[in-house]
Amino acid sequence: MAVQKNKPTRSKRGMRRSHDKINIHKFSVDKVSGEIHIRHCLTKSGFYCGKKVLNKKNK
């Protein structure tokens, strides 16, 4: 069983926790449709980097 030898300092604890923050998604505007979307993701209309890559099928 692992048992620590020394108590971690407040500084070391803070350094460990510094990467636990929640990141906010970056948004961008599509060149063609003008939609706001998350970076590196498709828009709702199927555009990616200004090109139509996904066609919606009507049911």
From Swiss-Prot:
It holds the Pfam family Ribosomal_L32p. One of its GO terms (biological process) is translation. Residues 7-19 have a biased composition (Basic residues). GO terms for molecular function: structural constituent of ribosome. GO terms for cellular component: large ribosomal subunit. InterPro entries: Ribosomal_bL32 (IPR002677), Ribosomal_bL32_bact (IPR044957), Ribosomal_zn-bd (IPR011332). Keywords: Ribonucleoprotein, Ribosomal protein. Residues 1-20 are annotated as: Disordered. Belongs to the bacterial ribosomal protein bL32 family. HAMAP family: Ribosomal_bL32. NCBIfam families: rpmF_bact. This is Large ribosomal subunit protein bL32. The gene is rpmF.
